[in-house]
Amino acid sequence: MILSDRDIRSAIDSGHLGISPFDPTMVQPSSIDVRLDRYFRVFNNARYTHIDPKQEQEDLTSLVEVKEGDAFILHPGEFVLGSTLEEFALPADLAGRLEGKSSLGRLGLLTHSTAGFIDPGFNGYITFELSNASNLPIALYPEMKVGQLALFMMSSPAETPYGSGSLGSKYQGQRGPTASKAYMNFR
């Protein structure tokens, strides 16, 4: 069951769902808007001949901070990581689905490649997988709305929510755009 605006506000007001900073105007009929932070991870294309998910490639990306009032320019075909301005704390009985904003999608901005699902128990900032499918560069401004998070009530709380020690939750507690930790799946 997807939470309605009323259910989202109730979950936040009761402390069941954590969102910080929380802006009540971001609550939509069946989702909550999410904003872009000022940090991006850009790929260092000249450092490697290819990306190898089995290897830890520490300098594959570099962190870039956009100064106040400036924009990050995402070029056609470019792929970077960004993150939400908001920090989330999902309880064991709520899961989330990140989607892009329709108005930005119509300009060619994709907010995630494959990782749009947010597990119950997740705590941290959500990483965006941003790409520009248009033929022109797109200006991305810190604090602009770039996505929406729909929340789903599960049939029962997860027995082992994300962040439980046995799961090896690689991205629990992440702050800012977090580079891939796919190499940990090969250990």
From Swiss-Prot:
Protein name: dCTP deaminase, dUMP-forming
Source species, domain of life: Bacteria
GO annotation terms (biological process): dUMP biosynthetic process; dUTP biosynthetic process; nucleobase-containing small molecule interconversion
Class of this enzyme: hydrolase
Pathway assigned to this chain's UniProt record: Pyrimidine metabolism; dUMP biosynthesis; dUMP from dCTP: step 1/1
Family: Belongs to the dCTP deaminase family.
Site (Important for bifunctional activity) residue list: 116-117
Keyword Transmembrane helix: no
Family annotation (HAMAP family): dCTP_deaminase
